Design a protein with these regions (language model features):
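Extended, highly charged segments
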Residues: 1-168
Length: 168
């Protein structure tokens, strides 16, 4: 179980007393964009949309064809246009155990003292994971799980370089 302020991907059947406000929907849109094909496409901006579950169907109406593995979306879509393709990764300690987390850059910056902001780029994610491993000691498997693809580091605060030591 993670503390409530730790960014994490959660799948829930219903929200317990929480409502989805515009800020949470924007965070979900940023994450959906970062984990989509837009990341490997290398673009700096992208567009995503959201729909209600009842609007998604695997069955076709008369005269329509739906290919294997495809879905049909009917009705009004909520569009999130011209969003930055970026993701934040950060280092936190949960019950004394260091963990790497990913989320929206703003949320990770607010939660994790050691963090980095990433954008699509040319550095292979395995190479970046090895660099972070040498600095933090976290396993490369954990790091690869939070990196969406080849990326460039936009901002960095202690993830690629050791944090500054205070002199006594």
């Amino acid at each position: 179980h993670l503390p409530p302020d730790v960014p994490a991907y959660r799948l829930v059947d219903k929200l317990e007393g929480e409502s989805l406000n515009e800020a949470k929907l924007n965070e979900a849109a940023v994450l959906a964009l970062a984990w989509s094909r837009a990341w490997n496409g290398g673009g700096a901006h992208g567009t995503v949309y959201s729909v209600k579950p009842a609007q998604v169907s695997k069955s076709a109406q008369t005269g329509e064809f739906v290919g294997k593995g495809a879905f049909v979306v009917r009705g009004q879509r909520t569009w999130y246009k011209d969003m930055d393709v970026r993701i934040g990764i950060g280092l936190i300690a949960v019950n004394g155990v260091p963990m790497v987390v990913s989320g929206t850059p703003e949320h990770v910056q607010a939660t994790c003292p050691r963090h980095a902001v990433l954008a699509p780029g040319r550095t292979k994610k395995e190479q970046l994971a090895n660099t972070i491993y040498r600095t933090t000691g976290l396993s490369t498997d954990e790091l690869l799980a939070v990196l969406p693809g080849a990326c460039d580091v936009i901002e960095e605060y202690g993830m690629l370089t050791p944090p500054a030591q205070e002199e006594e």
